[in-house]
């Protein structure tokens, strides 16, 4: 609950600071002088409500969406010794991390992957792929589970929802300012909002959305390093490195994880350079090297 309260407080603070900053720099006067009659404070609040609403809804239904999109089967009563071991391992790691036991599931995929999601660190879901269970050693699976428990314990789902809400707000806000500026100043439209407003707003949202995604993915990559550190603390550095090395060997296999879930999986990060700016995970070799430096 404290994380949700922090979420709301941070959102309000962002809107307040942005509104004050725009006023101090005379942005309202600049827009009015150029024929754009906008109440920027009201527009900012409007964009914040819709921007954060989307990320909040996604956060609260994340477990349901994950189960539906991946076909995850929750283990309520273990039927095999592998399922029994999986439940016991997650319970042990959760206790060490100081969180409540999450739901545990298996999703039908050949690639080795796992994910954690949920709106609350004490109401989460941790799932692993069938391929990971079949091909990884118990120590490697335990390290992967420790990484996912690290995500839950660090509150990464709430953090990324917060970041996404902030960037959603400013993408909507500045796209509409650009749309109004193009419509009123460049095309001199004085009768409501013309076609130029809608075209410019859509184009601006696309461009700003790409830039915003880079910010969100940067935060996501930082959280992966932290989850690796948590995994190393819970399962041992050598086991965590071994699991990442094994994932690197399997990177050529096709990935069937839905795009909406890739940011919460353990496997990813194949691209470097500009393409790497839009990746949710750092390259595996970088993650392995970071753990080696950590010792």
From Swiss-Prot:
Where is this gene product found? Answer: Cell inner membrane
Known InterPro entries for this protein? HtpX_protease (IPR050083), Pept_M48_protease_HtpX (IPR022919), Peptidase_M48 (IPR001915)
Q: Name one GO molecular function term.
A: metalloendopeptidase activity
Q: Which residues cross the membrane?
A: 4-24, 41-61, 158-178, 199-219
Q: Which UniProt keywords apply?
A: Cell inner membrane, Cell membrane, Hydrolase, Membrane, Metal-binding, Metalloprotease, Protease, Transmembrane, Transmembrane helix, Zinc
Copy out the cofactor comment: Binds 1 zinc ion per subunit.
UniProt-annotated binding residues for Zn(2+): 147, 151, 224
Active site, per annotation: 148
Q: What is its EC number?
A: 3.4.24.-
* Disulfides per UniProt: none
Q: Name one GO biological process term.
A: proteolysis
Gene3D superfamilies in the cross-refs? Metalloproteases ('zincins'), catalytic domain (3.30.2010.10)
The record's annotation in CDD domains points to: M48B_HtpX_like
Its membrane topology: Multi-pass membrane protein
Annotated GO CC locations: plasma membrane
Q: Which family does it belong to?
A: Belongs to the peptidase M48B family.
Q: Mind telling me what this protein is named?
A: Protease HtpX
Provenance organism: Pseudomonas putida (strain GB-1)
Encoding gene, per UniProt annotation: htpX
């Amino acid at each position: 609950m404290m994380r949700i309260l922090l979420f709301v407080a941070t959102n309000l603070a962002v809107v307040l600071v942005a509104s004050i900053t725009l006023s101090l720099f005379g942005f309202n006067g600049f827009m009015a002088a150029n024929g754009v009659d906008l109440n920027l404070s009201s527009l900012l609040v409007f964009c914040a409500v819709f921007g954060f609403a989307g990320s909040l809804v996604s956060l609260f239904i994340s477990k349901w969406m994950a189960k539906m999109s991946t076909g995850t089967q929750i283990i309520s009563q273990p039927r095999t010794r592998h399922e029994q071991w999986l439940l016991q391992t997650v319970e042990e790691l959760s206790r060490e991390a100081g969180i409540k036991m999450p739901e545990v599931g298996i999703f039908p995929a050949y690639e080795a992957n796992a994910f954690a999601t949920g709106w609350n660190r004490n109401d989460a879901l941790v799932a692993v792929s069938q391929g990971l269970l079949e091909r990884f050693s118990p120590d490697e699976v335990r390290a992967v589970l420790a990484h996912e428990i690290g995500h839950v314990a660090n509150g990464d789902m709430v953090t990324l929802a917060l970041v996404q809400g902030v960037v959603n707000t400013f993408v909507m806000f500045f796209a509409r300012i650009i749309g109004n500026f193009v419509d009123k100043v460049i095309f001199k439209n004085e009768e409501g909002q013309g076609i130029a407003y809608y075209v410019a707003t859509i184009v601006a949202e696309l461009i700003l959305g790409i830039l915003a995604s880079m910010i969100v993915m940067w935060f996501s990559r930082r959280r992966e390093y932290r989850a690796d550190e948590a995994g190393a603390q819970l399962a041992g550095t050598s086991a965590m490195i071994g699991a990442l090395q094994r994932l690197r060997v399997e990177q050529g296999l096709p990935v069937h994880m839905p795009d909406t879930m890739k940011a919460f999986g353990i496997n990813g990060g194949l691209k470097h350079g500009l393409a790497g700016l839009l990746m949710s995970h750092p390259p595996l070799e970088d993650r392995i090297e970071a753990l080696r430096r950590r010792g």
